Amino acid sequence: SDVCSSDLFKKFCAGETDISNGSRPIKESEIELCKKGGIEYIELPIAFDGLSVVVNKDNNFASCLKTAELKKIWEPAAQGKINNWNQVRPGFPNQKLGLYGPGTDSGTYDYFMENIVGKKVGSRGDYTASEDDNLIVQGVSTDKGGLGFFGYAYYEENKDKLKLLQIDGGSGCVAPSTATIADGTYKPLSRPEFIYVKKEAATRPEVKAFVDYQLAAANSKLISEVGYVPMPEDIMMLVRKRFSDGTVGTVFANAPKGSKVKDLLEK
């Protein structure tokens, strides 16, 4: 879970761990922490995940939301002002909007807000925040006007209780699926999942064996089983090369919105 990508990076940059998982790329502040700690790292995307935006099962008016509408709902200026569905789009009913999502410490929150509201902006504070996705499911499924978001895998587990929305990121309405997440057409809410490996630990046999296992083609079945979307083999070849070459630093931290993983790895 990404309950705290931030905490994991803090430990990693302090030299307490050899490998850190991240449900988002390393942040500028963490790059500085690692620099201070003298930690060089290899950045490896290992799978894709998409964020699902869901509404109550009985919602019969919303099927696709534009990213601009999501922004209107979640931006800080919406606090106490955008309270009903008809304020999101004329034609939607005058029904109370109930918002549910992960807390501000989570990688999922960061990723959603950066791509929907904007970098370093944050969100309105008057929503029901929980680090437990199950509580978000419960909230949306019992609130007729509910809307929430979390990882795609979690929607798959709970799809009988919720309605999945399509998202229009500028090229028409697209629903998240293993296909649209892997090929990047579900944007801007599909993302890579990472591991960061401490450079000086990368040659240790047990660390190398663990990373090789994570990057092996045979691992894609396991990735699917835990609810993520495997990366296409042409991308995984570039990731394996990055590890075997010991290429340090980040290409994802300041990548422009909507960048393709393959393009970044080929830089």
Spell out what each predicted region is.
Residues 1-267:
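Flexible loop/hinge segments at secondary-structure junctions
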